[in-house]
Amino acid sequence: MSDTAVVVVDMMNTYQHPDAEELIPNVDKIIDPLADLIGRARTSENVDLVYVNDNYGDFAAQFSDIVGSALDGARPDLVKPIVPSGDCRVMTKVRHSAFYATALAYLLNRLETKRLVIAGQVTEQCILYTALDAYVRHFPVVIPTDAVAGIDAELAEAALKMMAKNMSAELTTAAECLG
């Protein structure tokens, strides 16, 4: 248990979807800072690490199935550096928010989380909705802007502004978000 949890959203991705062409270059830019953030979270006694990933409509899929599909997908190089370790907390989701129809809020409350770092993809979709759901649950939100990837640069920038202004999210870097 710690005061801070890092939630990695939707990074187990096959990159075989209509938005992949626009998304891939942006994900490529965040892999190193995100991998560093994940590595620091894994080794810290003061940070909890949770992966939440879309189940892509496969309600029978285990998290390991989703990871396997991502590693077999079009861009395994964007997946390998950030694959969750065997002892990592993982869960699947069915919609944009990592909170919707998941046990995330329950888990974070059990861990006594006081601060939530949200990283992953897509900034203007799943990151935004997860941040909003965290905010309405009274979790202070931190967004490492170099560890989130968007599809549309203009919408992603607007989403970051909305999170900062409307949700009091702290916008920082992956290197600085854990202190």
Each PLM stretch: what is its role?
Residues A20-A41, E45-Y51:
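A short alpha/beta connector and helix-capping loop motif
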Residues A5-M11:
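N-terminal nucleotide-binding beta1-loop-alpha1 segment
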Residues A60-D65:
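Metal-dependent catalytic neighborhoods of phosphoester/phosphodiester hydrolases
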Residues N13, G57, A149:
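Short, glycine/acidic-enriched loop or turn micro-motifs at the edges of active sites
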Residues M12-P18:
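Short acidic, Gly/Ser-rich segments with clustered Asp/Glu that frequently serve as metal-coordination loops
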Residues V47-D54, F59, P144:
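Short beta-strand segments at enzyme active-site cores
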Residues V6, H17, I30:
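N-terminal beta-strand-loop-alpha-helix module at the start
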Residues M1-A5, D36-N46, V67-G179:
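Active-site-adjacent betaalpha module
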